[in-house]
UniProtKB/Swiss-Prot annotation:
Pfam families: MbnB_TglH_ChrH. InterPro entries: MbnB/TglH/ChrH, Xyl_isomerase-like_sf. It comes from the Bacteria. This is UPF0276 protein CV_3513. Belongs to the UPF0276 family.
Amino acid sequence: MSLTTLPGVCGIGLRAPHYREALDARPELGWVEVHSENFFDGGTPLAMLRRVAECWPLSLHGVGLGLGSAARPDRGHLASLRRLVDETCPAAVSEHLSFNHSPHRYVNDLLPIPYTRAALDTVAGHVSETQDALGRTILLENLSSYVEFPDNEMNEGEFLAELVRITGCGVLLDVNNLYVNRINLGTDTDAVLAALPPDAIGEIHLAGYSEREGMLVDTHSQAVHDEVWRFYREVIRRIGPRPTLIEWDLDIPPLATLQAEAAKAQAILGGADERS
């Protein structure tokens, strides 16, 4: 199973305010990504997504499976995701390395997990179960976290690398999340990147953070900050060009603003291609 069939260019996270404009104008968007769960109930949103998938390569990005939870993935959720995959034939499917549920409770958030051998065994089982249910490889995204577990036995990059080795999954590298963790927690981002097998990185995310009470918060509500652009350039120099996405989920701007952000990333990707 290949990691993705996304083109090696920059795309955008396509959100509801832009569906009709995008479908009417058919701009050059590279590729688009949507949140999987928004389409589980079918109806008009799914009909719209089918049209989107006919126009641009599509990535399905999940926020609800919680593969880092102790409880197994919800069977109903997996079944809904499989139906969506079958109906839209996405170029990539991804989830977060986070937890959000127990057998009788669900939290609508992306919560961090401990990077221990015990957690690794649990998550690897859930990833394998998910890939078997979907009949394809998924990408796992690194998380923005605001706490660290004192019993961590490895860093996030080492944990993801082990998941890649055990399950054959890929990595969705969120550069903004990694930068936020560097500032908030003092994460050694060089060590995280060094631990990740470059060939396993199938996609990159870029987004804007907010500052709250001296911390950086991954809100996806602003343009990509200059510091993150510089970090992105470092990452691309290190691993080579990768399909890259501009995420913007709150205070969503005009579509043209997203296209302008994507053009910045594309210029960096193009420069890397010229040097290679």
